[in-house]
Design a protein with these regions (language model features):
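Hydrophobic residues at beta-strand termini and immediately following loops
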Residues: 28-30, 70
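Hydrophobic alpha-helical segments typical of transmembrane helices
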Residues: 3, 17-20, 78, 107, ...
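Cyclic nucleotide-binding regulatory domains
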Residues: 9, 35-96
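Polybasic "coupling" helices that flank or enter modular domains
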Residues: 93-96, 101-158
C-alpha cells in the first residue's frame, strides 16, 4: 500500500503537506519474525505497513498474549513511548516478510508544529486509535477468543 493511501485513510492531506511528510520517511524491508518494536524499550520511530502482517503481543506469566493484528496500511507505534517517552509494554512481530515506511518520532513532532494539515492528520490518527482501543476493550470483556477471531475475520476479511 502506498504511503499516500495509508495517510489518507485517516485524513486527506494536501499534496504539499504529504510531500513534506514523505521526505521524512524511509522504506525498509524486514524478514518474517523480526521484532519491529520491543517491550521494555523506548521506541523512537513510527512504522507504516506498506506490505505485510504484524502481531502485537505482551507477555504475562511466561505466555505471549496477542492483542492486535495489523495488515497493510496499519501504523505501528508504541503509544507509551510516543506520548511519555517511556519503555513500551508491547512487542510487534512481523508474521511474514514485510516492507515498512519508517518515520522518526522527533521529525513527526516537528512537522506537527510546522504544518497544520499534518497536525490535523496526527489528531485524527489519535482519535481513531482511541476508538479502536475502546472497541478492542469492549470485545475482550464481552467475547470469548473464538468469537473475537470470528469478529476479526468479519472486519478484516483479507
Amino acid at each position: 500500500m502506498d504511503i499516500k493511501e495509508i495517510i489518507n485513510q485517516r485524513y486527506a492531506m494536501p499534496d504539499a503537506s504529504l510531500d513534506r511528510l514523505r521526505q521524512c520517511l524511509t522504506e525498509v524491508s524486514y524478514p518474517k519474525g523480526f521484532h519491529v518494536l520491543e517491550s521494555g524499550k523506548i521506541e523512537k520511530d513510527i512504522f507504516f505497513i506498506k506490505k505485510g502482517i504484524v502481531r502485537a503481543y505482551t507477555s504475562a506469566d511466561g505466555k505471549e498474549i496477542t492483542f492486535w493484528v495489523g495488515k497493510e496500511g496499519a501504523t505501528l507505534v508504541s503509544m507509551k513511548g510516543y506520548v511519555n517517552d517511556e519503555p513500551g509494554y508491547e512487542t510487534m512481530e512481523l508474521m511474514e516478510d514485510s516492507v515498512l515506511y519508517v518515520l522518526e518520532r522527533k521529525k513527526l513532532k516537528a512537522l506537527f508544529s510546522e504544518d497544520l494539515h499534518i497536525a490535523n492528520w496526527g489528531r485524527r490518527y489519535a482519535e481513531m486509535e482511541l476508538l479502536a482501543t475502546e472497541e478492542r476493550l469492549i470485545s475482550m470483556l464481552s467475547a470469548i477468543a473464538s468469537e473475537r477471531y470470528k469478529e476479526l475475520l468479519e472486519k478484516e476479511p483479507d
